[in-house]
From Swiss-Prot:
One of its GO terms (biological process) is canonical glycolysis. This is ATP-dependent 6-phosphofructokinase, muscle type. GlcNAcylation decreases enzyme activity. It comes from Macaca fascicularis. Allosterically activated by ADP, AMP, or fructose 2,6-bisphosphate, and allosterically inhibited by ATP or citrate. Its cofactor is Mg(2+). Residues 391-401 are annotated as: Interdomain linker. It holds the Pfam family PFK. Residues 402-780 are annotated as: C-terminal regulatory PFK domain 2. It catalyses: beta-D-fructose 6-phosphate + ATP = beta-D-fructose 1,6-bisphosphate + ADP + H(+). Residues 2-390 are annotated as: N-terminal catalytic PFK domain 1.
Length: 780
């Protein structure tokens, strides 16, 4: 990367103008995207305009199109909805309306349009672009614009960001707003669960999503619902019979409640709608259960955006500006979307076409095709749901294997969800599943018991670790561990935990040379708030911790905004890993985030103080600085606080907050529940396969490197990687992987906080095609 290229990003937008609008239904996280578009646009030297009230504002012009400033997008990151307003616009559907919109853009010299909305809004934008030259011709003929203006605005660049709570847009794994909508739904489901258990009730919950069952499907996975109705996969013709049998079976197993999730577009095989009332009447009539219906409605669109949506919106906004400014008359209108944790650019019309194909397939009752078109992520969710909710464990355990599940390290939200799915998938496969209490220590002491189906009932939504977890490593107690492996006939180990789970795995590999009993397959599922396990881009529990930090930062910023001229220094957890500090910095709009991976000196601290001094001269009179707990042994939180207090005398005062163990607590977020559930299922499927492969002469013998793995999410796929192969990628002294993907997001944090830095554009997304993405390895 040459210095010239580095510098190019800062001058990329000079002489250009970008307009940003939000259209269609609002979604949480739209404000994060608007803020990123405005700030990165200004950073590149472009002028940026707000278009208020969506396409209606574009058509009406006047005060609806206003130039944005750096400060005009301050304090909007944590707000739900869209601050610049949205409207469903009839005028823009007519050519006359689009002509007026073109006139309003040309007069302001705007040739770049960033549209944040659903598929309808994006299709409208593409139509507008394809007609652009004709519209200019008409305006010239009518004498409304000069030839010079027409030449200057000869082509229109369009980039779309998908903002929709339904996640119904093909080509992106997550749309802006989906994660926050899931947060709202899960909060409600958790609240309803307690009342349902008290009265032994059945609840039928109707969630939004139009013709897409994503919200309903993920909700049912995240709360362990008994049944889900989604439009893409209508139930079989005798579903009434199956549903009632399933509900009464659950009650027989000792459950005090039933939860049924219905997508608002749910239909049967003949395309006839299935309503919540129909289901309620059926359950009351056939089973006589006390049944209530709750329609969640617009609650799902409201509230604060989750950390995931704020980061997604910010990343997509940055990418959108780059795509617009790099655009030429020949580049097609594109959508910036998410694949795994990678930002990708896809041709807008290809995505719209596939989205329409889903609707068409459903109308033609080709449900299998509709499911495939929704993408790998959707299909994986559906497969895991079907296994957990509809397959019964076999009665006989003949030819079964024994697998033990344990937690290692510090507690992390989502551990219990991973244990639940591991245990249940194991039972479904006909295995005996044992649970080990208190990690490797419990394995050595024999704190082991068999788990049945209902042992893990209701665990998905519970935080912490119900099995108990310890940081103890196995090496010291190999003899006792080997004895217990023989005593309980353990043939495979699923280890759910943080860095200790990984190092424990390495020790088990080492111990195989001495103890034959340790020659059994094992798999590590990364679960730690620090997100520092080699071999995985994400760990179970990190998303929950991130949201906890985010909520706290929002409250602290609000306090600072009230007092004025105040800077807060907040210390986050994570050991030496700066993931939480960096991502929370992005999600909470921090001015700086100090981390171990990016060494800093006293000069950097001084520069940050200078930066805050300048900031206090603007209308935004507050500061937020995050510091990872082990970023530097000498520049402690107290040191930074004292430095800021001294240097800021008379200009701002400082306060400090150490967040501590609250970051490990709380009920798991939908992302962590879902991720943990799928990781558990995937791990158990792998385990069954490898046990069969390692079965020789009546016993298990696994001593190959690939029989001890970490299951991790890498870019776009879930992969099993031998722990021994990951050794070279690990910095053991600081307990972090040598390469971390999220470090590439650090410059975004600095630009959004108004630092003059060089932006490396070499890693920006390139245009891909949707067909390739669908056939490639899917994300979780």
């Amino acid at each position: 990367m040459t210095h010239e290229e580095h510098h190019a990003a800062k001058t990329l937008g000079i002489g250009k103008a970008i307009a940003v609008l939000t259209s269609g239904g609002d979604a949480q996280g739209m404000n994060a995207a608007v803020r990123a578009v405005v700030r990165v646009g200004i950073f590149t030297g472009a002028r940026v305009f707000f278009v208020h009230e969506g396409y209606q504002g574009l058509v009406d012009g006047g005060d609806n199109i206003k130039e944005a400033t750096w400060e005009s997008v301050s304090m909007m990151l944590q707000l739900g909805g869209t601050v610049i307003g949205s409207a469903r616009c009839k005028d823009f559907r007519e050519r006359e309306g689009r002509l007026r919109a073109a006139y309003n853009l040309v007069k302001r010299g705007i040739t770049n349009l960033c549209v944040i909305g659903g598929d309808g809004s994006l299709t409208g934008a593409d139509t507008f672009r394809s007609e652009w030259s004709e519209l200019l011709g008409d305006l010239q003929k009518a004498g409304k614009i000069t030839d010079e203006e027409a030449t200057k605005s000869s082509y229109l660049n369009i980039v779309g960001l998908v903002g929709s709570i339904d996640n119904d847009f093909c080509g992106t794994d997550m749309t802006i707003g989906t994660d926050s909508a899931l947060h709202r739904i899960i909060e409600i489901v958790d609240a309803i669960t307690t009342t349902a258990q008290s009265h032994q009730r059945t609840f039928v919950l109707e969630v939004m999503g139009r013709h897409c069952g994503y919200l309903a499907l993920v909700t049912s996975l995240s709360c362990g619902a008994d049944w889900v109705f989604i439009p893409e996969c209508p139930p079989d013709d005798d579903w009434e019979e199956h549903l009632c049998r399933r509900l009464s079976e659950t009650r027989t197993r000792g459950s005090r409640l039933n939860i049924i999730i219905v997508a608002e577009g749910a239909i049967d095989r003949n395309g006839k709608p299935i309503t919540s009332e129909d289901i309620k009447n059926l359950v009351v009539k056939r089973l006589g259960y006390d049944t209530r219906v709750t329609v969640l409605g617009h609650v799902q669109r409201g509230g604060t955006p989750s950390a995931f949506d704020r980061i997604l919106g910010s990343r997509m906004g940055v990418e959108a500006v780059m795509a617009l400014l790099e655009g030429t008359p020949d580049t097609p209108a594109c959508v910036v979307s998410l694949s795994g944790n990678q930002a990708v650019r896809l041709p807008l019309m290809e995505c719209v076409q596939v989205t329409k194909d889903v609707t068409k397939a459903m109308e033609e009752k080709k449900f299998d095709e509709a499911l495939k078109l929704r993408g790998r992520s959707f299909m994986n969710n559906w497969e895991v749901y079907k296994l957990l909710a509809h397959v019964r464990p076999p009665v006989s355990k003949s030819g079964s294997h024994t697998v033990a599940v344990m937690n290692v390290g510090a507690p992390a939200a989502g551990m219990n969800a991973a244990v639940r799915s591991t245990v249940r998938i194991g039972l479904i496969q006909g295995n005996r599943v044992l649970v080990v209490h208190d990690g490797f220590e419990g394995l050595a002491k024999g704190q082991i018991e068999e788990a049945g189906w209902s042992y893990v009932g209701g665990w998905t939504g519970q935080g912490g670790s119900k099995l108990g977890t310890k940081r103890t490593l196995p090496k010291k107690s190999f003899e006792q561990i080997s004895a217990n492996i023989t005593k309980f006939n353990i043939q495979g180990l699923v280890i759910i935990g943080g860095f200790e789970a990984y190092t424990g795995g390495l020790e088990l590999m080492e111990g195989r040379k001495q103890f034959d009993e340790l020659c059994i397959p094992f798999v590590v599922i990364p679960a730690t708030v620090s997100n520092n396990v080699p071999g995985s881009d994400f760990s179970v529990g990190a998303d929950t911790a991130l949201n906890t930090i985010c909520t706290t930062c929002d409250r602290i910023k609000q306090s600072a905004a009230g007092t004025k001229r105040r800077v807060f220094i907040i210390e986050t957890m994570g050991g030496y890993c700066g993931y939480l500090a960096t991502m929370a910095g992005l999600a909470a709009g921090a001015d700086a985030a100090y981390i171990f991976e990016e060494p800093f000196t006293i000069r950097d601290l001084q520069a940050n103080v200078e930066h805050l001094v300048q900031k206090m001269k603007t209308t935004v009179k507050r500061g937020l600085v995050l510091r990872n707990e082990k970023c530097n042994e000498n520049y402690t939180t107290d040191f930074i606080f004292n430095l800021y207090s001294e240097e800021g005398k008379g200009i701002f005062d400082s306060r400090k907050n150490v967040l501590g163990h609250m970051q490990q607590g709380g009920s798991p977020t939908p992302f962590d529940r879902n991720f943990a559930t799928k990781m558990g299922a995937k791990a158990m499927n792998w385990m069954s396969g490898i046990i069969k492969e390692s079965y020789r002469n009546g016993r298990i013998f696994a001593n190959t490197p690939d029989s001890g793995c970490v299951l991790g999410m890498r870019k776009r796929a879930l992969l099993f990687q031998p722990v021994t192969e990951l050794q070279g990628q690990t910095d053991f002294e600081h307990r972090i992987p040598k390469e971390q993907w999220w470090l590439k997001l650090r410059p975004i944090l600095k630009i959004l906080a108004k630092y003059e830095i060089d932006l490396d554009t070499s890693d920006h997304a390139h245009l891909e095609h949707i067909t390739r993405k669908r056939s490639g390895e899917g994300a979780v």
